[in-house]
């Protein structure tokens, strides 16, 4: 593998390298077999992992050679033997073949992505979920058009093969990939045989397919983002439109006099901002009405033609977002644009002007959150807390940990809002629901539970909340923090409530297209 990396770096035509002979390297399947054992050791019983089970690389080679045949490739996904030992051995060969195929395809993909990133050094992009919050504060309110696009998990097998065919010149190496994808589609229980439903399992093969597909989807926007990045520091047209521009003065881009005309011309291009999390992406465009209208019309058509989606164009769902509300990371955020008066003063007080601009003022959406809590049986439709009966079989620590995790994620996400009265109402609902759940489990009352547990209820969240609300700064900085908005984007994992809300939104979109 290291030699292949070195040859690919020295030779510019590394895309034409022959990948098919790599499928027959024993070292490759030794690595993939070790990966499979490491991944299955935590879930398989120890008696099933005895040393008597011999793994034959010759069998794997024969399976690779016969993979084009219908009766051999289907064994990769269908195991009919109920015996767990035989079933595990079949799965071992299947997983090794998939792991080996993934390792071979990852080599040219890693080289390709490395060269692509090195060629985009001038494009200062933020590749973290923490960049979503600055995007909502700085870019979202000042954009003319904001669209929410959902990339489907259901992808036709031929589309995946064609994405690899664009940058891999060795066509025989893609025949096993095509056979595996089509056999998986035929062996699945889905009624829609024209697509492949990528399962939400943590397998390296399907994760690699999904990452490669998303990489291709984002590649069509790279040239547009690179072009708009030259005027990113002046994206709003004037500094007063930034609330705290004195903190961002170091990011000012000074144009030279020689390139002044070219820089002014680049400011006429629309500023495009792109954010993606999972299968959802947000594109914000700022520019003239005519340019925004053209981008709204041509971007979906170009995406469909680029990925050969003209047979099912509805699978890429895109709709315009309202500036009064937005959704990211599976959460829902209500926005209020508040007018802000900004005074600008030149040197020696030669010129003083008052400018009125809009400020991003997020609000905690009480009604949608209460509705979501009622669907998950934490409260009724009016917001009265009830016990979570499905959790009464858990231990006390598990119940407290689950409620603590839900509240901590909600608090961290909505901590950037000015008005927190609604957020503390949500905390009251969750804390009382937790107390009722414990009381129902022990067949006691809430008063007895509170007396026994005391400060243990949401102890982690309360301590974290005090730490966030009272930072160890000076008195002047602490007073300023009371007036300013602070985003605490410490979200270790997505809230289960966010998944439930996202499923409801996706179901509404699918029902809309089915009508």
UniProtKB/Swiss-Prot annotation:
Residue stretches spanning the membrane: none
InterPro entries registered for this protein in UniProt: Domain_X, Maturase_MatK, Maturase_MatK_N
MF (Gene Ontology): RNA binding
A biological process term (GO) from this entry: mRNA processing
Localization of this protein: Plastid, Chloroplast
Keywords associated with the record: Chloroplast, mRNA processing, Plastid, RNA-binding, tRNA processing
PANTHER family in UniProt: MATURASE K
Role according to the record: Usually encoded in the trnK tRNA gene intron. Probably assists in splicing its own and other chloroplast group II introns.
Family per record: Belongs to the intron maturase 2 family. MatK subfamily.
Protein's UniProt name: Maturase K
Lineage: Eukaryota, Viridiplantae, Streptophyta, Embryophyta, Tracheophyta
């Amino acid at each position: 593998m290291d030699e292949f990396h070195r040859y690919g770096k020295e030779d510019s035509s590394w895309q034409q390298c022959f990948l098919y002979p790599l499928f027959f390297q024993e070292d490759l399947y030794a690595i993939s077999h070790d990966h499979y054992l490491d991944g299955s050791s935590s879930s398989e019983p120890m008696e099933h992992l005895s040393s008597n089970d011999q793994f034959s690389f010759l069998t794997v080679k024969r399976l690779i050679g016969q993979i084009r045949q219908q009766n051999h490739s289907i064994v990769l996904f269908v195991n009919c033997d109920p015996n767990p030992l035989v079933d595990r051995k079949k799965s071992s060969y299947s997983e090794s073949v998939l792991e080996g195929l993934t390792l071979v395809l990852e080599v040219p993909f890693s080289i390709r992505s490395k060269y692509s990133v090195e060629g985009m050094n001038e494009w200062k992009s933020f590749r973290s979920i923490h960049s979503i919050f600055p995007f909502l504060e700085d870019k979202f309110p000042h954009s003319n058009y904001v669209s929410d696009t959902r990339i489907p998990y259901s992808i036709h097998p031929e589309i995946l093969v064609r994405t690899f065919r664009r940058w891999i010149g060795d066509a025989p190496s893609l025949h096993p990939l095509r056979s595996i994808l089509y056999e998986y589609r035929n062996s699945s229980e889905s009624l829609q045989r024209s697509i492949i439903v990528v399962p939400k399992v943590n397998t390296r093969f399907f994760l690699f397919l999904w990452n490669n597909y998303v990489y291709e989807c984002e590649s069509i926007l790279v040239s547009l983002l690179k072009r708009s990045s030259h005027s990113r520091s002046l994206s709003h047209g004037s500094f007063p439109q930034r609330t705290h521009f004195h903190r961002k003065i170091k990011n000012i881009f000074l144009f030279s006099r020689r390139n002044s005309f070219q820089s002014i011309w680049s400011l006429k291009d629309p500023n495009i901002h792109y954010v993606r999390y999972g299968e959802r992406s947000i594109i914000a465009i700022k520019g003239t009405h005519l340019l925004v209208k053209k981008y709204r019309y041509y971007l979906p058509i170009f995406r469909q033609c680029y990925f050969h989606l003209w047979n099912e164009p509805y699978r890429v769902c895109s709709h315009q977002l309202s500036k009064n509300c937005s959704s990211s990371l599976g959460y829902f955020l209500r926005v209020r644009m508040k007018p802000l008066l900004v005074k600008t003063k030149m040197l020696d007080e030669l010129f003083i002007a008052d400018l009125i601009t809009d400020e991003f003022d997020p609000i905690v959406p009480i009604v949608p959150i209460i509705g979501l809590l009622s669907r998950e049986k934490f409260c009724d439709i009016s917001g009265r807390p009830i016990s979570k009966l499905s959790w009464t079989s858990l231990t006390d620590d598990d119940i407290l940990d689950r409620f603590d995790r839900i509240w901590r994620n909600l608090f961290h996400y909505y901590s950037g809002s000015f008005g927190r009265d609604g957020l503390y109402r949500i905390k009251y609902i969750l804390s009382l629901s937790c107390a009722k759940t414990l009381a129902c489990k022990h067949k006691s009352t809430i008063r007895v539970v509170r007396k026994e547990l005391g400060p243990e209820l949401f102890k982690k969240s309360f301590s974290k909340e005090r730490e966030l609300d009272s930072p160890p700064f000076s008195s002047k900085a602490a007073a300023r923090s009371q007036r300013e908005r602070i985003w605490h984007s410490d979200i270790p994992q997505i809230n289960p409530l966010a998944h439930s809300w996202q499923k409801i939104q996706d179901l509404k979109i699918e029902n809309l297209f089915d009508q």
